[in-house]
């Protein structure tokens, strides 16, 4: 969970991970302002259509795009958004859910 003022950190983390040895594609995402998922994808693999992947990840409730090797996506959490009453325990469980869901979505779309 990060504030909208710190959302640039998502891209910074994705850029940093791409610089690691043997990493050709990196993905970083976060719950931003408690009401949306924002993600950043970086890839040195020209065969991976990052802008298309980001657009698909944004889906009908968000958006996404990019250019060769770089992209971002977002979508609203709707009724699952943090209304300010989530305690740390619930936030931890919610993050576990979001993390697992995003990883499954990414793997499914990349294997297409």
Predicted regions and their residues:
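Gly/His-enriched, cation/cofactor- and phosphate-binding structural elements
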Residues: 1-112
